[in-house]
Amino acid sequence: QDGVERITSLTTFADLGALPHDVSTTATPPDIAPLDRCVSAASSPEHVRRMAPLMQRFDLRFDPDCIGWAHGAPNGVGSMRAWMRLADGREPDVMSVLMTLDSLPPTTFALGMPGWAPTIELTTHVRARPAPGWLVVQHRTRNVAGGMFEEDCEVWDSAGRLVGQARQLAMLPRH
């Protein structure tokens, strides 16, 4: 961009269909409010929608316990949970899982630190092809230090399978 390298990428691809189908995990889907109790991102205040235009590509329904920040009352817990599907009605696929891994506002919003949080490093894993239907996505941070925070993400499909994971290191938003 303007003659300056802004991003580098290292990617590894595999055939998900060639992987064994056995699953042994202690991971469990997040505790999220039922879909009909969640709040559509489309009802977000205009300033929030302007900050995150990517959200318009999804039908996002936020767990009401996670969105106090949108109304000036962050809950102080570094976690966001939402139901997600593509806005155009397509069923989820591997590419939409990748997009979902970085689709929610930074968890720093819930900590009372809204704003752009530049990514330093992002690692993503697509674990399986998703089943049709809504995806559940959860972002969490456990450590804010040195002007940075880590954010872990999990994406679960409608069959209750963990289909995507990510870890991101980002800079704190500037106030």
Predicted segments, located by residue:
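Terminal targeting signals and extreme-terminal segments of soluble enzymes
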Residues: 1-175
